[in-house]
Swiss-Prot record:
Protein name: Ribosomal RNA small subunit methyltransferase G
GO cellular component, one term: cytosol
One GO MF term attached to the UniProt entry: rRNA (guanine-N7-)-methyltransferase activity
Disulfide bridge partners, by residue number: none
Family: Belongs to the methyltransferase superfamily. RNA methyltransferase RsmG family.
InterPro entries per the UniProt record, alphabetical: rRNA_ssu_MeTfrase_G, SAM-dependent_MTases_sf
Catalytic reaction annotation: guanosine(527) in 16S rRNA + S-adenosyl-L-methionine = N(7)-methylguanosine(527) in 16S rRNA + S-adenosyl-L-homocysteine
Keywords from the UniProt entry: Cytoplasm, Methyltransferase, rRNA processing, S-adenosyl-L-methionine, Transferase
Length: 233
């Protein structure tokens, strides 16, 4: 098992590669979160990944690699108040990417939704122990979430394929907001199914950038969607 000092060096190197400049206290909080995830995972089976090194790459750095894009979209000037700066993490599970985003970006407000109560209990515990006033958890299906303000960004990492993601959560997106789905290989088949379902009449694909996860030899893409101008009318 890699020691804590080595893991910290790996995380700091990964943050530099991603382009995230975090204070030492924020890095401490990221590690405190990983410690909580390992502790709770032994009892509640929050994730199949259990080795600390893999948790660092497959969970933490995988989520942090998406933070620049998520934060930029959340802070976008064209998203009006009160949705500006608000992010919804759908199917957050053990808190990815919601908690790393909240730790890295204190000005961004993150609501994490999951249908599994033990997972939202863990997220609520993390909020309390890590002192994250900009993070909250909600237990229940996203399609039943009642939120009048809307969100500048709605994201998911391992929730569902694109058609379901759009159908279940799209109504919560604020005008000019972005749906940002975290995917592995380029999801052409999912995009084709979106078109076949008729969703492209209301939604457009703004970009599908490939992102690099430090220490992980696997493809990662973000699918960035927004409502077509005609859908706002």
């Amino acid at each position: 098992m890699t020691d804590d000092a080595t893991q910290r060096r790996r995380l700091e190197a990964g943050l530099a590669q991603i382009g995230l400049a975090l204070a030492p206290a924020q890095i401490d909080t990221l590690f405190a979160y990983l410690a909580l995830l390992r502790k709770w995972n032994g009892v509640y089976n929050l994730t199949a990944i259990r080795h600390p090194d893999e948790m660092l790459t497959h969970h933490m750095l995988d989520s942090l690699a998406a933070v620049p894009a998520l934060a930029e979209a959340a802070r976008a000037a064209e998203v009006g108040t009160p949705a500006r700066g608000r992010v919804l993490d759908v199917g957050s599970g053990g808190g990815m990417p919601g908690l790393p985003l909240a730790i890295a970006c204190p000005d961004v407000s993150v609501l994490m939704v999951d249908i599994v109560q033990k997972k939202t209990a863990f997220l609520t515990q993390c909020r309390a122990q890590l002192g994250l006033s900009n993070a909250a958890a909600h237990w229940g299906p996203v399609e039943k979430l009642d939120d009048a303000s809307g969100f500048a960004v709605i994201t998911s990492r391992a929730f569902a394929e694109l058609t379901d993601f759009v159908n279940l959560s799209g109504q919560l997106l604020a005008p000019h907001g972005k749906l940002i789905a975290m995917k592995g290989v380029y999801p052409q088949a999912e995009l084709d199914r979106m078109e076949a379902a008729g969703l492209m009449a209301q939604w457009q694909v703004d970009a599908v950038p490939r992102i690099t996860v430090p220490g992980l030899d696997a493809e990662r893409h973000l699918v960035v969607l927004s409502r077509r101008a005609s859908a706002h009318a």
